């Protein structure tokens, strides 16, 4: 009887630990999703504005509307700097998505472990 009780305690602890980990990961996923969605929306808005500004800059350059080469170079450098910051934000978002996907895989792995634990307790599964 003591072996059965010890076995039950061990399995019960593992179930609870898996559930605790799943809850932590699920909460983290919800937070990450909100952050990613917000970052992507802002990035897309900023990219749209940036692309419009680049298009306007190129149009002014083709029409020779800059008062000097220095004015052209200053505005071009400012646009390049903004483009580089946008590229960095894109890389940050990609890293956030990668972390999110890794957490999804951890949650799926916990689900598979929980299923194996359930199957090991199901006497009919052991016979199959």
Protein language model regions, located:
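Extended alpha-helical coiled-coil "stalk/arm" regions
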Residues: 28, 35-78
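Feature targets compositionally biased, intrinsically disordered low-complexity regions
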Residues: 32-33, 63, 82, 110
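C-terminal amphipathic alpha-helix
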Residues: 1-22, 26, 72-128
């Amino acid at each position: 009887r003591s072996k059965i009780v010890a076995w039950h305690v061990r399995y019960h602890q593992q179930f609870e630990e898996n559930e605790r980990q799943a809850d932590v990961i699920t909460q983290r996923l919800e937070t990450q999703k909100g952050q990613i969605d917000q970052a992507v929306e802002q990035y897309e808005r900023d990219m749209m504005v940036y692309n419009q500004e680049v298009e306007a800059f190129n149009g002014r350059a083709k029409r020779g509307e800059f008062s000097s080469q220095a004015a052209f170079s200053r505005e071009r450098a400012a646009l390049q700097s903004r483009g580089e910051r946008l590229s960095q934000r894109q890389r940050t978002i990609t890293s956030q998505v990668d972390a999110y996907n890794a957490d999804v895989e951890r949650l799926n792995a916990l689900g598979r472990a929980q299923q194996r634990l359930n199957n090991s307790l199901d006497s009919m599964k052991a016979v199959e």
